[in-house]
Amino acid sequence: MKKLLFGVLVIASGLVFFSCTQKSGFLGADTLKTIELVAADSQIDNIVEMASYESDVFSLGNSSVTTFSAGLKSAVPGGGFFNNMFNLFPNFKLRYMRGICPDLTITTTNGGFPKTMTVDYGTGLELANGHILKGKIIIVLSAAPFISGSTRTVTFENFCADLVCISGTSVKTRTKDTQPKFSETCNFTVTLANGTTINRTAEHVRSWIAGSDTEFNPADDVIAVTGKVVVSDSKGNEYSKTITVPLLRTGVCKFITKGVIEYKNSTGKFATVDFGNGDCDNKASRTTQNGTTEITLGK
């Protein structure tokens, strides 16, 4: 993996390597506004998907959901909940830099459901892949997570990843498929470092194609995401995005590693973004009628 510095959504003035051949099927000329919008939005996709996976790490662990109860908190290895976790699942600490994990509190009524999990990152906690998280993720589980029809309601409270802050709620529902699969509806507000706010309403399907049977071991996790997002922002931009090739998220990479998103506005399709062939790097390619450009997903 490339060594990367922090600082997401700092958009470079030259997004380099334009093709000289025009592409058919795209409407509207390239403008600086379009270039910046797609580059920034691709970085936001990466952050939002990382935050969703982070909620999965905790709420899909049957041991934490069904075995542990209230008041389990420890920000450092060697005490309480995470002492048990490190003994039972030593690979879990590999997700967090120096093995320092967020506080976790689980509250329940008489040991049953619903259960509420609060994951607290405090004022800043670093993942092993370089993201810095702060704030809280609050997860309410209606039942054990792999029971068909069970729901997980995930709320982001004062939550930020690097320089991107997320507020709002998603609901993940276990489908009847044999493969671990969850339908997801999201209503998020994303705030960037420059004060821009972005409203995102999404319908996704998240399929665990590997790793769901090894609790708290991010090394073998692979998730495929499909669906659509409707976006509006404080600068007056409105558009929709459809995932035409499933996005792949692994448990150890900082970035989306594969997949294609198609962008449309009121005039039609204006861009696509290809996240690559599965390699773990911070590059994606953006295609419009003027050709293909390499963009950066973060630092």
Predicted feature descriptions by range:
Residues 1-4, 22:
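Positively charged n-region of N-terminal signal peptides that target proteins for export
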Residues 5-13:
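Sec-dependent N-terminal signal peptides
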Residues 16-19:
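C-terminal motif of bacterial Sec signal peptides marking the signal peptidase cleavage site
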Residues 22-299:
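Low-complexity, intrinsically disordered segments exposed to solvent
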